[in-house]
C-alpha cells in the first residue's frame, strides 16, 4: 500500500483533520539510520508528525523544523518538513535500547526523556522564523504535540502517532492523525470526538488490517459528515548536495579552512539526514580556501 496524507473536515468544518499512512516513509528513515526498534518507533512518530504538519505550510519555500530532546538515551530527534509532504530527520542515538514499558510496548517515552523541550520552528520566509516551544509532556511524542497545539497555538487537539516494528526490524505499519476543534465548535462535539478517539483501536492495528486512511477516518467520524479535501503522497527526501556541503564547509572561516588544508588530510563530511558521504581532497580544500580569500 502506498503512503498517503489526506486533509479533511467533519461537522461542517467544525473539526479539522490531517491523517496519513506513512509506513514506507518511516521504513526508509529507519533503514537509513539503522535504527533499533525503539529508535525506529521514536523517529517514525516524529517523521509522521512532520509530514502531517508540513502539509499546512502555504509555500514551497517554507519549511517546518521539529525538535525534541528530553535528556534520554535517544539523544534527541530533529525533523524538517515541507508543504509537499516530504520530510527528513535524524535521531542522536539510533542504537538506543530500552526494556518494554509497563504496557508491554516500546518505551519511546523513556528513550526520549521528559527533561527538556519540544520545539516547533516555522520558516515562513519572513525576517525571523516562528519558534514555539513547550516542556515535554510525556516523551511519547503524540501527547507532546497535543500539548503543544493546545498550549502554544491555543487549538485543542488530539494527536495519534503510531509505528509498528516487525521482527526483522522493518516497519510493518506507521501512520497518524491530528484532529483539531475549531473555535466555534461546541463542547458536546468535542466530547463526542474525544470519546470516538478513545474507543478506536491503535492506528497501526487498523493499517495492519489493510484499511486505507480514508477508511480509517470514515470509521472514526461515521455520521459526522466527513469531507475529504485533498490528498498527497508523503516521502522521505533529503535535499543535501555537494554544492550545499561546500558552502557549509566554506562558512567555517578562512582560519579553520587553512588548518584543514595544512593538515594535508582528506576530509569526509556525512549528511546527518541521509548518511550520504561527501569526500574532499586537500586540493578541494585548497580551492575552497582560494575562493574564500578572493571574497
From Swiss-Prot:
Which keywords does the record carry? Answer: Chaperone, Cytoplasm, Disulfide bond, Redox-active center, Zinc
Q: Which organism encodes this protein? A: Clostridium botulinum (strain Alaska E43 / Type E3)
* Entry superkingdom: Bacteria
Claim: DNA damage is one of the keywords in the record: no
Q: Select a single GO molecular function from the record's annotations and give it.
A: unfolded protein binding
Indicate where this protein resides in the cell: Cytoplasm
GO BP annotations, alphabetical order? protein refolding
- Family, similarity comment: Belongs to the HSP33 family.
Which cysteines bridge via disulfide bonds? 238-240, 271-274
One GO cellular component term, please give it.
cytoplasm
Modification after translation (UniProt): Under oxidizing conditions two disulfide bonds are formed involving the reactive cysteines. Under reducing conditions zinc is bound to the reactive cysteines and the protein is inactive.
Q: What is this protein called?
A: 33 kDa chaperonin
Instruction: Cite the InterPro entries for this sequence.
Output: Heat_shock_Hsp33, Heat_shock_Hsp33_C, Heat_shock_Hsp33_N
Underlying gene: hslO
Q: Membrane-crossing residues?
A: none
Q: Which CDD domains match?
A: Hsp33 (cd00498)
Q: Explain the purpose of this protein.
A: Redox regulated molecular chaperone. Protects both thermally unfolding and oxidatively damaged proteins from irreversible aggregation. Plays an important role in the bacterial defense system toward oxidative stress.
Amino acid at each position: 500500500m502506498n503512503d498517503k496524507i489526506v486533509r479533511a473536515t467533519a461537522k461542517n468544518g467544525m473539526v479539522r483533520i490531517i491523517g496519513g499512512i506513512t509506513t514506507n516513509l518511516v521504513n526508509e528513515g529507519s533503514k537509513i539510520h539503522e535504527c533499533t526498534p525503539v529508535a525506529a518507533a521514536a523517529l517514525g512518530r516524529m517523521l509522521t508528525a512532520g509530514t502531517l504538519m508540513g502539509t499546512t505550510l502555504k509555500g514551497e519555500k517554507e519549511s517546518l523544523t521539529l525538535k525534541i530532546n528530553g535528556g534520554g538515551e535517544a539523544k534527541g530527534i530533529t525533523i524538517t518538513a515541507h508543504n509537499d509532504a516530504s520530510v527528513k530527520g535524524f535521531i542522536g542515538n539510533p542504537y538506543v535500547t530500552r526494556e518494554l514499558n509497563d504496557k508491554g510496548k516500546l518505551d519511546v517515552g523513556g528513550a526520549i526523556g521528559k527533561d527538556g523541550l519540544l520545539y516547533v520552528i516555522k520558516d515562513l520566509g519572513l525576517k525571523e522564523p516562528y519558534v514555539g516551544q513547550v516542556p515535554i509532556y510525556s516523551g511519547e511524542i503524540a501527547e507532546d504535540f497535543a500539548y503543544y497545539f493546545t498550549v502554544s497555538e491555543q487549538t485543542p487537539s488530539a494527536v495519534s502517532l503510531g509505528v509498528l516494528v516487525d521482527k526483522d526490524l522493518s516497519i510493518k505499519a506507521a501512520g497518524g492523525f491530528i484532529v483539531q476543534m475549531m473555535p466555534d465548535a461546541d463542547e458536546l462535539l468535542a466530547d463526542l470526538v474525544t470519546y470516538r478517539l478513545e474507543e478506536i483501536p491503535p492506528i497501526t492495528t487498523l493499517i495492519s488490517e489493510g484499511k486505507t486512511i480514508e477508511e480509517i477516518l470514515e470509521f472514526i467520524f461515521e455520521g459526522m459528515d466527513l469531507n475529504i479535501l485533498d490528498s498527497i503522497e508523503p516521502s522521505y527526501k533529503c535535499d543535501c548536495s555537494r554544492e550545499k556541503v561546500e558552502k557549509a564547509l566554506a562558512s567555517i572561516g578562512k582560519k579553520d579552512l587553512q588548518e584543514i588544508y595544512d593538515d594535508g588530510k582528506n576530509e569526509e563530511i556525512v549528511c546527518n539526514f541521509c548518511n550520504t558521504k561527501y569526500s574532499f581532497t586537500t586540493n578541494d580544500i585548497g580551492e575552497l580556501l582560494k575562493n574564500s580569500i578572493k571574497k
